[in-house]
């Protein structure tokens, strides 16, 4: 088993759409109205992170120190930033899932139909999207399950996913 971060998605899209006074780009309509900035797209797709082998992971710090400055130096309209970044996301997900027959997409990005269409364009996979309840509560369910494994002293952290030297049971238990 292997898992890894492919690329940042909502953290970037929402950051830029927030500057328009919106929480998110509903259905990706703003991004769809923009134009791809090819130079920025090439720079994003050439970042060293995408050349690394998994396991690998991303954090807010990397986005703030790498992605935002790269985008901000271009002084683009927000709709063009969103359009370019959606294309970047779709390319990266497509590249990372080329060998996958099925692709199960979860998270807030599933509500961005333009993003999903662009991912489908670059992916050879059959895309499945779960019910809204699963999308909204996925992380709570996963972390509850990881907590249960920890309480039972079972492995909840796989080295193939995290890059750790061995599988282990991670987390702290605090009792009242």
Model region roles, listed by residue range:
Residues 100-119:
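Glycine-rich phosphate-binding loops at beta-strand->alpha-helix junctions
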Residues 62-69, 114-124:
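Acidic-glycine-rich active-site phosphate/pyrophosphate-binding loop
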Residues 93-101:
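Phosphate/pyrophosphate-binding loops at sites that engage ATP/ADP/AMP, CoA/4′-phosphopantetheine
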Residues 120-142:
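Conserved phosphate-binding/catalytic loops in two-lobed NTP-binding clefts
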Residues 8-13, 85, 115, 136-139, ...:
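Catalytic-loop motifs flanking and including active-site residues across diverse enzymes
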Residues 146-157:
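Alpha-helix capping/hinge segments and adjacent helical runs
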Residues 2-86, 90, 152, 162, ...:
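Conserved ATP-utilizing enzyme core subdomain
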Residues 5-6, 106, 130-138, 162-163:
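Active-site nucleophile and cofactor-binding loops and adjacent substrate-binding regions
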